[in-house]
Amino acid sequence: MKEISVIGCGRWGTFLGWYAANYRVDKVTLYDIPTSPNFLELKETRKNSYLTLSDNMFLTPDLNEIFKNDDIIISIGCQHLRELAKQINQYNLSGKHFLLAMKGLEEPSAKILVDVMAEEITQDDVHFACLGGPGHVQDYLKKVPSCAVIDSREEAEKKHWIELMQSELIRFYYGTDVIGNQIGAALKNVIGIAAGILDGLEWYGLKGALMARAPVEVGRFIKHFGGNPMSAYGLAHLGDYEATLFSRNSHNRLYGELLAKGEQSSKSAEGPMTLKAVKIISDRDGIEMPICQALYRVVFEGADIKSTIRGMFEREVKREF
């Protein structure tokens, strides 16, 4: 009997558990801390705003139950990953496979998530992969198919997770650049904030320019960390633009739109914390990141939105390529 575990009962983690339970495995165990509002809602009603738990999905506040399975998906806030990794390193993790389903960088280090896990998990025979690419829960539940990418520093680990998760609903591709795909997935959230600001200002025509120039900037950041800048044009970054820059379901786009309107979003968004990390590293190492620098001034320094965003597109004239 195939079984997997999921750590994190938020929107995405619960969906991935539901997806696995309905398309790929016989049993899914979902974990969260017992005081988590998401966990309490699922425990009381067996549903959230998006889906109803299948009969083969089980909830637990006990990590011992999670580690009865070898395949574990993690979907929590990126800034809590190191703390979780330290906690679970106290368990016997030999032979375990972890799929990190979040999109972000650690702040302030700007470390990719697989490296955060590798630093804190000190045991042997523990394997890490990451998930990236487009897709919204609302679309998947309508059976709208999509594609995603799974990457790892271990070729066998990519194969392991793709064979476990592949279905007619989600086609998974093998990643070839774990650094580029993790950074690309994280920074698409930042670019989503920029797109939302343009929506809030009703400057829709600049979205095309944003889509053309942002991958160039993200590619620089990827290259700085030893990745392939072309990964910015793959599924994890450019391939996720429709779901992040245009969709009404994008939390990061909504964050930017409401910011431009002088309002606050009640939805969680990973983009702002990733933006902080990018700002620190780009300043320290002299990486040219004009879009991210402008966004930082708007989001964290209270800069005038219209003049700052306009200035971002009025920099010194240069060749496109």
Feature annotation, model-predicted:
Residues 67-69, 187, 238:
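Alpha-helix C-terminal capping/helix-to-coil transition sites in glycosyltransferase folds
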Residues 51-58, 124-126, 168-170, 287:
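A short helix-to-beta-strand connector/capping loop
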Residues 1-61:
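NAD(P)+-binding Rossmann beta1-loop-alpha1 motif at the extreme N-terminus of oxidoreductases
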Residues 194, 202-233:
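Oxyanion-binding "anion nests"
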